[in-house]
Amino acid sequence: MRTSRFLFATLRETPNDAEVISHQLMLRAGMIRKLASGLYTWLPMGTRVLKKVDAIVREEMNRSGAMEVFMPVTQPASLWEESGRYEQYGPGLLRFKDRHDNPFVLGPTHEEVITDLARNELKSYKQLPVNFYQIQTKFRDEIRPRFGVMRSREFIMKDAYSFHATQESLQETYNVMYDTYSRIFTRLGLDFRPVQADTGSIGGSASHEFHVLAASGEDDIAFSTESDYAANVEMAEAVLVGERAAPTQEFKLVETPNQKTIADVCQFLNADPKQSVKALLVQGVADEKGNVPVVALFLRGDHELNEIKAEKHPLVAAPLAFATEEQLQAFGLTAGFTGPQGLVEKGITVIVDRAASVLSDFVAGANEADKHAVGVNWERDAQITEVFDLRNVVEGDPSPDGKGTLQIKCGIEVGHIFQLGTKYSEALGCKVLGEDGKPFTVTMGCYGIGVTRVVAAAIEQNYDDKGIIWPQAIAPFEIAIVPMNAHKSPRTLEAAEALYAELQAQGFDVLLDDRNERPGVKFSDLELMGIPHRIVIGEKGLDAGTFEYKGRRDAEASNLTKEELLAKLAR
């Protein structure tokens, strides 16, 4: 491709509404332009990257044995009503009616559509297992689209759905897809981690997310320093460490006027937050009569509650909700000053996090306004109903697999795989005949990759102060050739044309910068766009039989003979 025939839409200034680096650089490099909130047009430069990601994903999905289909983004609302998600999904689901007053939705995902296809096309266990995939547009009506294509309303996704006769068959395909995703992200040149994850609104029994490590990531992931263990912080188990020591202090109450937070209390008492507990009073599961009990959750003062873990406790209502003022008053409790003493005796379930359960001589609320208790000890001063993992892990915690300690880094979720079980097949009546001639409900898995998000995530992981640094596999062009003074030097242009043709014949994506621009402008544009290899051809180099070569990550350029250059470029 020649720059004289290509849309160069680079910007010198960063648009004010671009928050994260990928959004800034995609705009400046001429990859995308905003059409409306959360909607973007992909320009030729961006489309080239998008198509390369698309090709790698498609190649690996085909290699896995999955079959490509293409489903409508517009879906009948009746399918979503059948699955029970029409109301459950919330305002992110864009609903509308056609001219005949038939209700439809714009698909944020395709579980309903693919299950409808399967129930009509799959008749026998002999047709199983099957795995269908598509690369298709999705629409989610985000309340606040932000970060460019990282969280847009319209986006491209690769979604796959598998159907099975048994859980064992699902597990086999799940493992294949896990390996397939690992190959995809490796080929894309990304530093990523597969992590155990919560199934969220999709549902199901098992789930892994694939995260690209980047400082701008919205998710915290924990992984071992000495093993392959990795999990979303929401899912990472906080291992019990140590044993409770015998009491050495007497229990007593102290005045703590207007000191409501743990930080304030510990500073006021000159105490270590690690030697304190904090209470979170939440609503429990209602009984047969509709009465909602209060459940007291206690954590160490320096730890944070993991709401997903708390919601998994059978006595805690989901979604998590704090106890009302009326409920607190009924037990004589004051928010900000609640301690564990006497709660079990009042009929309140006391669930204590593992780390808090091994404390002795700790600080806690006194169950009186403007007072706290010091020298508190479990069993002697306060009873525990149950010890349960309630907290987020922190850096340095032991890895749950017993190997090393945990590191925590930010990640951008670019892929997610689920074992759905029969959630959708049961709801939509997707059954096939078994070996015994009787119908049974099929078991499902689903597997997604955010194709447009991958592009942004790659930039978040690969950039410097000059612009993007693309992994070669997805760079819009692999090589840029810059002939110096081409409009005045036929010899330079001729050499550039010859090298351009030779490299193209070898299968490289090559950009010949034949613009009548100053060299500095050309170099700046090429660095901004992140092209991995730059070759400059000038009169002096031709006299010496060399080409000036600079890799995008190189600090300095070097002069290479043609043989050295071709060896450097060899894949």
Swiss-Prot record:
User: What stretch or stretches form a coiled coil here?
Assistant: none
Q: So where does this one cross the membrane?
A: none
* Keyword entries, A-Z: Aminoacyl-tRNA synthetase, ATP-binding, Cytoplasm, Ligase, Nucleotide-binding, Protein biosynthesis
* EC number annotated for this UniProt entry: 6.1.1.15
* SUPFAM superfamilies xrefs: Class II aaRS ABD-related, Class II aaRS and biotin synthetases, YbaK/ProRS associated domain
GO function terms (MF aspect):
aminoacyl-tRNA deacylase activity; ATP binding; proline-tRNA ligase activity
Catalysed conversion reaction: tRNA(Pro) + L-proline + ATP = L-prolyl-tRNA(Pro) + AMP + diphosphate
UniProt GO cellular component terms: cytosol
**Pfam families, per database record:** HGTP_anticodon (PF03129), tRNA-synt_2b (PF00587), tRNA_edit (PF04073)
Q: Give the protein name, as stated in the record.
A: Proline--tRNA ligase
Q: Which gene encodes it?
A: proS
